[in-house]
């Protein structure tokens, strides 16, 4: 059984959605409302101590971090592999994934965060926004 803890506006969640769709896997979705700070719920922090989304739970075991989730899913369900068999090509795929995680995601995180939370935060007192 697969349960995916998500937030739909999360770029990382979208990456996992695409991987699960490519593998044609069904899963239960559990929405984590970041606006309500549900990512800090003690039960969720047991699954993902960083309190970020997404997190995949498979047979009671939690896998955090979108790139790790995608690799896990590809290894667990090897039909239609997404990761190449060739060691060199696999290293190139991981290099690209690392680039996305460490550079492109970091560059877009502030913009996507600002777009998502702008309306919510502009009505907050300044001390709460900090």
Regions picked out by a protein language model, each given a short descriptive name:
Residues 1-129:
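GST-like domain detector, emphasizing the conserved glutathione-binding G-site
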């Amino acid at each position: 059984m697969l349960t995916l803890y998500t937030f739909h506006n999360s770029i990382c969640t979208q990456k996992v959605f695409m991987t699960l769709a490519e593998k044609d896997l069904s899963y239960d979705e559990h929405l984590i409302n970041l606006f309500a700070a549900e990512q800090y719920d003690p039960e969720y922090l047991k699954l993902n101590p960083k309190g970020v989304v997404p997190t995949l739970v498979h047979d009671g075991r939690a896998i955090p971090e979108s790139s790790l989730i995608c690799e896990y899913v590809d290894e667990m369900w090897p039909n239609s592999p997404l990761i190449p068999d060739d060691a060199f090509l696999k290293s190139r795929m991981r290099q690209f994934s690392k680039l996305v995680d460490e550079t492109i995601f970091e560059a877009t995180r502030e913009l996507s965060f600002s777009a998502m939370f702008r309306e919510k935060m502009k009505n907050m007192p300044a001390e709460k926004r900090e």
